[in-house]
A protein has these predicted regions:
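Helix-loop-helix "sensor" segment of P-loop NTPases
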Residues: 1-36, 57-60
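Conserved nucleotide-binding/hydrolysis micro-motifs of P-loop NTPases
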Residues: 7-8, 52, 153
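Short, amphipathic alpha-helical interaction segments positioned at domain boundaries
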Residues: 152-162
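Minor-groove-contacting beta-hairpin "wing" of winged helix-turn-helix DNA-binding domains
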Residues: 144-151
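Winged-helix-like regulatory helical subdomains adjacent to P-loop NTPase cores
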Residues: 40, 44-121
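Short amphipathic alpha-helical interaction segments
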Residues: 118-135, 143
Length: 162
C-alpha cells in the first residue's frame, strides 16, 4: 500500500516545531530540498531529518549545506547491506539493476540499443532479469520507465558504482 506524500508545508511546521522543542533552528529550505530529492516520500525524508537533528547542536541552526552529509551518513550506514544485496543478485540481474540506476528512469530497456549501451546480454535476457528484479522489489515500473525502488540504494549505486 502506497501512502500519498505529506503536504510540504505541514511537514515544515512539524519539523520546525520538533527542532524548537530542543532549542534548535531548522532552515525551512531544507524541507523543500528533501521533498524535491525524495519525491515527498516520508521514510527517506525522515531518515535524513533524524541525522540532521542529531548533528544540529542545541542553540544551533540546521542549514542546507548539512543535507548531503546527512544523506551520505545514511548511505554509509546501509553500505554493507547494499553491498551484500548486490553481491547476492544473479549477475544478469545485477548488471540490469546497475544500468537502470545509471539511467535514472530507464526506458526502452528491452531494446537492443539499451543492451548494447550497457554491455548487457540479449534483450530476452534483459527481460528475464527485469522480471526477477520486479518480483524482488528492487525496481518498479512507473509508466514506461523502470526505476530503482529504494532511493537510498539508487544513490548508493551512483556514489560507489562509478
Amino acid at each position: 500500500m502506497n501512502l500519498k506524500p505529506l503536504d510540504v508545508e505541514k511537514y515544515k511546521e512539524f519539523a520546525t516545531a520538533k527542532f524548537k522543542e530542543r532549542n534548535k533552528h531548522l532552515d525551512a529550505a531544507i524541507i523543500g530540498e528533501l521533498f524535491a530529492r525524495f519525491g515527498g516520500v516520508t521514510s527517506y525524508i525522515q531518515r535524513v531529518m533524524n541525522v540532521l537533528f542529531l548533528k544540529t547542536p542545541e542553540q544551533g541552526t540546521c542549514t542546507l549545506d548539512m543535507v548531503d552529509d546527512a544523506i551520505n551518513y545514511n548511505l554509509n550506514m546501509a553500505s554493507d547491506t547494499y553491498e551484500t544485496l548486490l553481491r547476492q543478485m544473479p549477475e544478469k540481474q545485477r548488471n540490469v539493476f546497475i544500468a537502470i540506476s545509471a539511467e535514472g528512469e530507464a526506458r526502452s530497456v528491452k531494446s537492443g540499443a539499451f543492451a548494447k549501451k550497457y554491455h548487457l546480454p540479449s534483450p530476452s535476457s534483459v527481460n528475464s532479469a527485469l522480471k526477477g528484479l520486479l518480483e524482488k522489489d528492487f525496481i518498479t515500473q512507473e509508466g514506461d520507465a523502470y526505476v530503482v525502488y529504494d532511493k537510498f540504494f539508487d544513490l548508493w549505486l551512483k556514489k560507489y558504482m562509478k
